[in-house]
């Protein structure tokens, strides 16, 4: 089975900059990846509702409208999702045509946040993939997350990854918003097969023979779909899962913007210009 995982995060401005990035190019890549391989997972690892000039007016609705044209399989709220308060995030979550999730965010009393999911298990061509969505635990210090409670990013992520493996996941994928120091701890845990991480505003890939890792750039400038060729065999009732990663590099300067998305972008630009 060939599985493709495309991750993105830290995308704030609807328009491109110097012919690179922006939602119209991002959506073009997402649509093309899905068309090329039905076993594609498209994940968001945090930060889009703010900050941008237009978000100052619409509290991030423009980013929801644009991502709804090429919806994610799962979206993790970043700290900037709470810049306009919890109520606004709840409204934007309800307006999304994709699921938001984070295993380490609860209400003040520890009960689940309505509409916010947890670990997601997907069957991709017979491969059981567990998506572990984890938010940045420093969010309350830098954003307006009200009385929401954020459990420790690293410990919660590793515990959930190990549990997913025990529950029979063939592949464990972390979708996290956290800094590179925490990323290194997640990689060192050997609990994840793949980690898609945002927050650092940089682009990086690595593979240590156990975990394939992508730091998912900023503003959708550079994208790295990861293709995993997965071989599953069963012997004496035991499942053996083997895979190798192929990191592709896409400089979005070479991508033709998605027409539907570009029309929406042009409309938003006109609003700003007026």
Language model region names:
Residues 260-274:
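Active-site nucleophile-His-acid catalytic modules used for acyl/amide transfer and hydrolysis
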Residues 1-264:
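Acidic, metal/ion-coordinating pockets
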